[in-house]
Regions:
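Amphipathic, hydrophobic secondary-structure cores in small proteins
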Residues: 60-82
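Secretory/periplasmic and organellar redox-cofactor proteins
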Residues: 1-57, 76-110
Length: 110
């Protein structure tokens, strides 16, 4: 068993101030509204956004807040090189947390 397999699957509610928690909610709603594509993996999900620098910065803020309150998640926001590249957010953590990621970060079909 890897050392990280022992990280509890529990949000650390005290990790964020009330203002940060409110901001997290705003950013999470924006994430849900902005996702263009979802890819499912064995250990989590990947979400594609439009190529908008301002959105990328806000999603980086969401990643920072989620990392503080959900240390059991692996969060990776990337925007590869090239004119046609778009940002992707990869949220993983193993099979144990996949349903949490699905229910928390995956938008319902429109």
């Amino acid at each position: 068993m890897a050392p990280d397999d022992n990280i509890p699957i529990a949000c650390v509610l005290s990790a964020l101030t009330p203002e940060q928690r409110e901001r997290e909610g705003v950013l999470l709603r924006e994430h849900m509204a902005s996702v263009q594509e979802v890819r499912e993996h064995d250990d989590g999900f990947t979400f594609r956004y439009v190529a908008d620098p301002a959105l990328f910065v806000r999603m980086a803020e969401l990643v920072a807040l989620e990392h503080r309150c959900c240390p059991f998640l692996t969060l990776q926001l990337e925007w590869s090189r090239g004119q046609q590249a778009v940002p992707w957010l990869n949220i993983t953590g193993g099979a144990r947390i996949k349903e949490f990621v699905r229910s928390t970060f995956t938008p319902t079909p429109r």
